[in-house]
Amino acid sequence: PAAQAGELLLTGLVRSGVPVRAVPLGPLHARRIADRAAAEAELAGLAGVDEERARLEAAIKTDDGVFTRYAVSSWSGHLVRLAARAKLTPNAVTGISVGLAAIAAVWFSAGTRIGLLAGAAAFYLSFVLDCVDGQLARFTRRGTALGSWLDTICDRGKEFAAYAALAAGYGAVHGQDVWPLAIGAMLLLALRHAIGSAYADAFPPDRGGARRGPARSLTLPYDLDPYDGEAGGGRPRGRARRAPRLVWARRMVVLPIGERTAVICLVAPVFEARVTFLVLLAWGGVATLYMLAGRIVRSLRRAEG
């Protein structure tokens, strides 16, 4: 029957190995309509949906790191609304973020406790706006490839400027050279992004980068693992089986930009630049090894598949 067309289509996609994922509805409505009465009832329910709120919730990522999720995304939606009402473009927000990062670098270069505190506050606000520009682009549907590229370039530039300013400020106040640590942190970050970019080029999503399973007959039981063949049994696989704590731990161990921002904003004012760089190098080294191992394992799996 026509009412089951969606279910049959989804079944065919999944059993053909096409990657699909569930999208949370949030405050939106999505129901199967089988008759006129159900359609009229659903139309009445749709009238009460706050479309702006739904678009705002959809614009905020749910797969960010711990710091970004709780210290930024928990309240950045208010800034997105204000920016949209002020008719700011995502690129304009990116520019303001860069300006705040420049102010943070000036304060960091002072090397004093007050300078480090003020710099940390400005750098945090810069990161907040760095998240807001992408959220605004998704909320207003005005995102562009140029804006995404510009945002990425500015992210790296802001971090490198902060590292350089911290090193300069520490040398001015303490008379000690921590530039080797700062340069090491920059090189490690550049290496991590090179690894990620090389992997993305080797397995682009539009040319087989997304993991595809083998085609399978529609007559096979739904819980039979296609990788095990007809004699195999289903086995828990994928993110659906991972404990939430493990997911959060994996997001933190790779030291994403949110956690790097947290290290700069929290460690620098308390322990100053030297300890900040040591934390970034130690944590970044672990993250690089973890990421490299993961890329190798995934590459081997895809080569076998």
Language model region names:
Residues 8-17:
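Basic amphipathic alpha-helical segments that dock to polyanions
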Residues 4-5, 18-77, 154-305:
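A feature for the membrane-embedded catalytic helix bundles of lipid/isoprenoid biosynthetic enzymes
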